[in-house]
Curated annotation (Swiss-Prot):
The keyword Lipid metabolism does not apply. Homotetramer. Pfam families: PALP, Thr_dehydrat_C. The modification N6-(pyridoxal phosphate)lysine is found at K61. It catalyses: L-threonine = 2-oxobutanoate + NH4(+). PROSITE patterns: ACT_LIKE, DEHYDRATASE_SER_THR. Residues 338-409, 432-504 form the ACT-like domain. This is L-threonine dehydratase biosynthetic IlvA. The keyword Lyase applies. The lineage of its organism: Bacteria, Pseudomonadati, Pseudomonadota, Gammaproteobacteria, Pasteurellales.
Length: 513
């Protein structure tokens, strides 16, 4: 390497020097810092968004990739570079190598959507499809790096990559010197580490807040444990930050310089995607909206007013059909919609009476199916202004004698059951309900069904709906006796799909049992 970082664990001053001498602007752009006027008024703070979606590859990843590749020795450059990625890092490496006239080989999992493969090839990268997941692709890339004497370019855990991402912080200070807090998305930690170490060298009074998805919180868990640890599984909606283990160097830097970490869920991310569109007319990928989701939550939880707050739109490489899912979930994430399961008497006029009690509350969704002569279960969505109004509606219904369950935070209800209202089985079943994940690609659902069909247990309920993501989600019920349960779960382990037993879901119990 010929860059300024000669240590595996540089000091803050060494990182600062590396950022100041970085060559990232050979290929990267100085991206705008835009005012989010509507959101600023709503939150009582000055909110700004750093538009990294405006980079040539539509994400910040170009900075770190180019910083490392440009710093290679002439001998290393002559041998070419290799990386493993199914996302933004792949495009950053491909474009960086193309700009420098180098060979770039990107190893991508075999189930990578063709749109992402084509994007890498469009930036001049060679693509090798290998392995069923990222870990297998990465292992192959490291093997090829050794056998072909190519340099492996990691997505986050390298000082040169961290320094490249840190160039964003330098731009922020030049664009607005009055910043109070910067909210940064965290996956492997490269962006958070780069921004934090630079900020704390120059303006340590600025707070740097890491934002993680609740189901991919590798930094939060590492900070609690005092060291990087492996997560058992990660959520895949915000795939750009779906990392099982934070990097060793990124953790060291984040542990030293990050001020706090906030966790958000998928619905809060969806609401942030909507906010970004409404304020600056940009469409962020889920991980790209992560830091804004964290900003909004942090402001509310800590009652922050009158400050200047910055969030980073880290990327905008998303499948268009993901927007359908975002649109459906953003109202719940903004606490503008409540989902309720309500029991009403099965008699003439009871349905109308229920509607009268709701009064002028806007109804967003209403599903009903006759079940028996005694009572009916209805699934109702109502538009609300916040938690207080939701509780008022719940209290009003309960005071009128209705039994109900709030399903607003029930993921099985939001993802599956709301599309399945149609009555219970007429036959009593010994049934267990499972949620499965499988890679989305042509023929993937058929392959899943064929694999699942290898069981001799009867499928009693099934729901699948495409959301434009890299992974699909299926809800399936099986007729199982208690004595079959251990054998069945052992069989599921052998199938290789990520799964979860969700038999105790309130939505399932209310509508499908």
């Amino acid at each position: 390497m010929v860059n300024n970082l000669h240590s595996a664990h540089p000091t803050g001053a060494e990182y600062l020097k590396a950022v100041l001498s970085s060559k990232v602007y050979d290929v990267a752009q100085v991206t705008p810092l835009q005012d989010m006027a509507k959101l600023s008024e709503r939150l009582g703070n000055k909110v700004f968004i750093k538009r990294e979606d405006r980079q040539p590859v539509h994400s910040f990843k170009l900075r770190g990739a180019y910083a490392m590749i440009a710093g290679l020795s002439a001998e290393q450059k002559a041998s070419g570079v290799i990386a493993a990625s199914a996302g933004n890092h792949a495009q950053g490496v491909a474009l960086s190598a193309k700009h420098l006239g180098l060979r770039a080989l990107i190893v991508m999992p075999q189930n990578t959507p063709s749109i992402k493969v084509d994007a890498v090839r469009g930036f001049g990268g060679e693509v090798l499809l290998h392995g069923a997941n990222f870990d297998e692709a990465k292992a192959k890339a490291i093997e090829l790096a050794e056998s072909k004497n190519m340099t492996f370019i990691p997505p986050f855990d390298h000082p040169a990559v961290i320094a490249g991402q840190g160039s964003i912080a330098m731009e922020l200070l030049q664009q607005n010197s009055q910043i109070d807090r910067i909210f940064v998305p965290v996956g492997g930690g490269g962006l958070a580490a780069g921004i934090a170490v630079l900020i704390k060298q120059l303006m340590p009074e600025i707070k740097v807040i890491g934002v993680e998805s609740k189901d991919s919180a590798c930094l939060y868990r590492a900070l609690k444990a005092g060291k990087p640890i492996d997560l058992d599984r990660v959520g895949l909606f915000a795939d750009g930050v779906a990392v099982k283990r934070i990097g060793d160097e990124t953790f060291r830097v984040c542990q030293q310089y990050i001020d706090d970490v906030v966790l958000v869920d998928g619905d809060e991310i969806c609401a942030a995607v909507k906010d970004i569109f409404e304020n600056v007319r940009a469409i962020a990928e889920p991980s790209g909206a992560l830091s804004l989701a964290g900003l909004k939550k942090y402001v509310k939880e800590h009652n922050i007013q009158g400050e200047t707050l910055v969030n980073v739109l880290s990327g905008a490489n998303l499948n268009f059909h993901t927007l359908r899912y975002v649109s459906e979930r953003c109202e719940i994430g903004e606490q503008h919609e409540a989902l309720l399961a309500v029991t009403i008497p099965e008699q003439p006029g009871s349905f109308l009476k229920f509607c009268h009690i709701l009064g002028h509350v806007p109804v967003t969704e209403f599903k009903y199916r006759y079940a028996d002569d005694k009572q009916a279960c209805i699934f109702v969505g109502v538009r609300i202004t916040g938690q207080e109004e939701k509780q008022t509606i719940i209290n009003q219904l309960q005071q009128n004698g209705y039994d109900l369950i709030d399903l607003s935070n029930d993921d099985i209800a939001k993802t599956h059951v709301r599309y399945m209202i149609g009555g219970r089985s007429n036959s009593p079943l010994k049934e267990r309900l499972y949620s499965f994940e499988f890679p989305e690609q042509k023929g993937a659902l058929l392959k899943f069904l064929e694999t699942l069909g290898q069981t001799h247990w009867n499928i009693s309920v099934f729901h699948y709906r495409a959301h434009g993501a890299d992974y699909g989600n299926v809800l399936a019920g099986f007729q199982l006796n208690d004595e079959d349960l251990d054998a069945f779960n052992q069989h599921l382990e052998k199938l290789g799909y990520v799964y979860q037993d969700v038999t105790e879901s309130p939505a399932y119990r209310y509508f499908l049992v």
